[in-house]
Amino acid sequence: MTEKWIDAVALYEIPEGDVLGVTVEGKELALYEVEGEIYATDNLCTHGAARMSDGFLEGREIECPLHQGRFDVCTGRALCAPVTQNIKTYPVKIEGQRVMIDLS
């Protein structure tokens, strides 16, 4: 599969240790800053229709604001009930001060 890097946001727009919701080419994503690294997942919880960008980020775990299920934002792994399905992650790279995401 060919990579297709898309300019999502400026790096400074993602608060340190927090999450930012963005729409990239019509797709809702959540971008996370964890210990100096940026990670990207789908913005909707796999359990309910809650936006992950409205959740609480602690370390590398995001807590869904609706039912308090948690995901590892680095791997997408579902960590506790009621979530059982992993959340999709996307490759991220930084070019200059821009956050680039591969949606392919």
UniProtKB/Swiss-Prot annotation:
Cofactors that this protein relies on: [2Fe-2S] cluster
Residues making up the signal peptide according to the UniProt record: none
Keyword flag Electron transport: yes
GO molecular function, one term: 2 iron, 2 sulfur cluster binding
GO biological process, one term: catabolic process
Family: Belongs to the bacterial ring-hydroxylating dioxygenase ferredoxin component family.
Summary of the function given for this chain in its UniProt record: Component of the naphthalene dioxygenase (NDO) multicomponent enzyme system which catalyzes the incorporation of both atoms of molecular oxygen into naphthalene to form cis-(1R,2S)-dihydroxy-1,2-dihydronaphthalene. Functions as an intermediate electron transfer protein via a specific interaction with iron sulfur protein components (ISP) (NdoB and NdoC).
Name of the protein: Naphthalene 1,2-dioxygenase system, ferredoxin component
Organism: Pseudomonas aeruginosa
Organism lineage: Bacteria, Pseudomonadati, Pseudomonadota, Gammaproteobacteria, Pseudomonadales
